[in-house]
Amino acid sequence: MEGDDTPYSAYGRYYIRINDADIPMESGQLQRFFEEKESNYSKWEEAETDYGPDDINEDLLIECIRTANEKGRLEYVYRNANEALNKLGLLTENGKLNNAGLYLFGNKKPLTIKEANYPTDDRSEFGEIKEFRGNVFECLSEAVSYIQNHISYRARIVGVQREETPEIPIRAIREIVVNSFAHCSYAKKGDFHQFAIFKSSVRVYNPGPIIKNTDPMKFASGLVGSKIRNILISSTLFKCGYIDAFGTGFDRAFTLCANAGVEYQYRNDDF
């Protein structure tokens, strides 16, 4: 047989391609596919790299451990990088960083993100395009700062003070950016986070949709619980206070936008 057995979606259904024919997938087949994908992705996080505890940003690790203790999400006093990384599940039995540890704290700039600022609502002309490289925490901070520095602000005078209000609530921006790093598919080669500011919108793209194609609107409404692709990465983000354990980040972001009169939209691409 010829063709690719990886399913694709069209008109609300999933299909596989066999001998030039589009075969609809049954629900049981689709469930097994997603379960296999989830299992394989956990193996990616746990896979050993060529790097060790000396190849991390130790100051960042110390700060994360301190924050985790302050928030009551970890009971551990930092003594050394090796012990702390083990505590977070980020070292292999051979004392090497796994992929999750490298991407979270590595000083080898494992991630590349792309940022752009467009003066109109299309890509025909741009004011700035740049790339930034770093680990998850560094790229996350850069993305939030970039958006914050390029969106518009409304100003008013209160007494003798000038008050500026961002067109999009900064807390909502942070929630969406953090979730993009928590839920993305890091194993996808040649794909990058993209953060683009247009005249009337901000667009955040991350490689891969939420696991099992879950609609984040269902997270926000409480119809489904939190679903995690990156168990080790998300666990560390939770301990450090970047995300919570119940998938309420989307609800906060959507509520903040609604209260500020900001329209929002989410599109879930194929798994």
Show which residues each predicted segment covers:
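Conserved short secondary-structure elements within globular domains
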Residues: 1, 254, 258-259
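A short beta-strand-to-loop motif within the catalytic HATPase_c
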Residues: 266-268
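Elongated alpha-helical scaffolds
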Residues: 1-11
